[in-house]
Regions:
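FIC/Doc superfamily catalytic core
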Residues: 1-229
Length: 229
C-alpha cells in the first residue's frame, strides 16, 4: 500500500521512468482495485475513456490511445535539466499527471506521489515528511477550482497555462510547509538515535509514514494499522 510506495520513492536509485511509475502505481493502488478498474495485462495505462464527474462532467482524461506518447513526454520532462525552480517544476508535474489521468482510479494520489518523488530525486528527502495529502484535502475546493480555471482559460485562449494551479499550490500548500512540522533539531536527534541503534528501521519507517500521511492530524490505532499494514 502507501507505505510501500513511500519506501519506493525514498530510494533515489528508483528514478522516474514509465516502468517505475507503473511499479509504484501497482504497489500503492492498482493491486487493490476492483477488477473493472485495474489495468489490463501488459498495459501501463488505462485502455478506455475516463471522466471526472461532479455535478457535471468536470474533466475528460486524455484519449487513452495518446497516453503512451504523452506519458513518455512527461517522464522526459521530469528528467530534463532545467533552470526552473524545483518546487514549481514538481507542481507542474503534479498538474500534468492528473490532467492526463492515465488510470481509471488513483490519479490524484499518484500525482501527489510523483510530486514528492521528483523533490526526493532533486535531493529534498525531507519532502517525505510533508503531509501534502492533508494540505490538498483541506483545500480541495480550491484545488479543483484551479484545474477548472486552467481548462476554462485554455478554451478561451487555446493555450494551456498552468499558472492558476501554481498559484493555488504556492498559497495553499507550499505556504504551509513550516506548519506543524518537526524542527531540524528533532530530525537530527532522531537520525542520530537511528545511527546509534536506539531506533529500529521499522520504527523509523512508521515515524516517517505518520508524518507524511497524517502530519499533525489525529488518527486512531485502527486507522494506522489499516494504512501502514
Amino acid at each position: 500500500g502507501m507505505k510501500q510506495g513511500l519506501e519506493f520513492i525514498a530510494d533515489r536509485s528508483h528514478t522516474i521512468t514509465e516502468e517505475n511509475l507503473f511499479r509504484l502505481y501497482q504497489m500503492t493502488i492498482g493491486d487493490f482495485l476492483p477488477a473493472e478498474d485495474r489495468l489490463l495485462p501488459e498495459h501501463w495505462y488505462r485502455h478506455d475513456s475516463v471522466y471526472i464527474v461532479g455535478s457535471k462532467v468536470e474533466h475528460t482524461g486524455l484519449p487513452w490511445q495518446k497516453l503512451p506518447a504523452y506519458m513518455a513526454e512527461l517522464v522526459a520532462f521530469a528528467a530534463e535539466k532545467t533552470e526552473q525552480n524545483n518546487l514549481i517544476k514538481a507542481a507542474i508535474l503534479h498538474f500534468a499527471f492528473a490532467y492526463l489521468h492515465p488510470y481509471f482510479d488513483g490519479n490524484g494520489r499518484m500525482a501527489r506521489l510523483l510530486h514528492l518523488w521528483y523533490l526526493v530525486q532533486q535531493g529534498y528527502s525531507s519532502a517525505l515528511f510533508v503531509p501534502m495529502s492533508r494540505f490538498v484535502e483541506e483545500s480541495r475546493s480550491r484545488y479543483y477550482k484551479a484545474y477548472t480555471q486552467v481548462e476554462q482559460n485554455q478554451q478561451i485562449s487555446g493555450v494551456l497555462d498552468v499558472t492558476p494551479f501554481l498559484v493555488y499550490f504556492a498559497k495553499s500548500v507550499y505556504h504551509r510547509l513550516g506548519e506543524d512540522q518537526p524542527q531540524p533539531r528533532t530530525l537530527q536527534a532522531f537520525e542520530e538515535a537511528l545511527r546509534q541503534g536506539k531506533v529500529t528501521e521499522k520504527e523509523r519507517a512508521l515515524w516517517q509514514f505518520v508524518l507524511t500521511a497524517y502530519g499533525s492530524e489525529e488518527f486512531s490505532t485502527k486507522r494506522l494499522e489499516k494504512d501502514f499494514g
